[in-house]
Amino acid sequence: MRHFLSLNELTKDEILYLVDLACRLKSEVKRGFFFPYLKHKALGLIFTKASTRTRVSFEVGINQLGGYSLYLSKNDLQLGRGETIEDTAKVLSRYLDLIVIRTYAQSEVEEFAKYSSIPVINGLTDDYHPTQIIADFQTIFEEKGRLKDLKIAYIGDGNNVAATLLVGASKLGLDIAVATPKGYEIKKEVVDFAKDEAKRSGSNLIFTDNPKEAVKDADVVYTDTWVSMGQEEEKEKRIKDFEGYQVTQELMKLAKEDAIFLHCLPAYRGFEVTPEVIDGPQSKVFDEAENRLHAHKAIMVFVCLGRI
């Protein structure tokens, strides 16, 4: 039994294993095979943030693996009325077999895991989004046939997705260029962690405020919304601050000819990306979204059973 709270705790080999397992599980489904690796296992989903892809993919995923799910809104639990995280974790550990938490503070997920005797999976916090990045790496592997000798360019807000992508790339030895406006950089402690990983893996890390510099000769161009959940009051300011950071056809032309475009969704066309890019032939965003299902299954199997 283990938790899945961020990519920081995973080794390169474990990340590659999860990608491989996700591909295998996807192949099984495509061939009509559903193996009950988690037969009769109960998955609890505790969400305080809205969700489309994370919730649906985990619920469908545990079903495909032979288990079942319970959606537990924070307001439906005594947790929403002041019961401690410690007590909630200890009680739910007696009923469930694994838990996915989607909330604001990373500290809440870590505290829950501290007192839980069953695996806890981080379904998204303000700091990290590790389940998403496993699906991203799966998509890149499917498109490029490898997870080495590649350059990723991330354009936009240095948010939870950017931070996790940076950590993952630095562990795998992938080059990554991050272009953010001043004031929206990835947190220093995450950058420092990635730099240490890059020394071991050979990753080339570039941090700039120039999207054109970041995208030059990239194999993958990635962006995310400029206004994340909980930042709605900052919308007008953020739209102004991110002027020039939109992924356009012109920007994509600076990447390699066979570069792919990724976005974790939801996307806001006309803001962080133009319709021509996200709906164009280089876009793999819906393959990426589909892979959330199989990546999440791989993560659930991994935390419950280890390697299979």
Curated annotation (Swiss-Prot):
Q: What class of enzyme is it?
A: transferase
Enumerate the subcellular locations listed in this protein's record, separating them with semicolons: Cytoplasm
Chief location of this protein within or outside the cell: cytoplasm
Give me the residues that bind carbamoyl phosphate, please.
51-54, 78, 102, 129-132, 264-265, 292
Q: Which Pfam families match?
A: OTCace, OTCace_N
Q: What Gene Ontology terms describe what this protein does at the molecular function level?
A: amino acid binding; ornithine carbamoyltransferase activity
What NCBIfam families does this protein map onto?
A: orni_carb_tr, PRK00779.1
Give the UniProt family note.
Belongs to the aspartate/ornithine carbamoyltransferase superfamily. OTCase family.
Q: Which PANTHER family match?
A: ORNITHINE CARBAMOYLTRANSFERASE, MITOCHONDRIAL, ORNITHINE TRANSCARBAMYLASE, MITOCHONDRIAL
Query: What is its biological role?
Result: Reversibly catalyzes the transfer of the carbamoyl group from carbamoyl phosphate (CP) to the N(epsilon) atom of ornithine (ORN) to produce L-citrulline.
Report the protein name in the record. Ornithine carbamoyltransferase
The primary gene name is argF
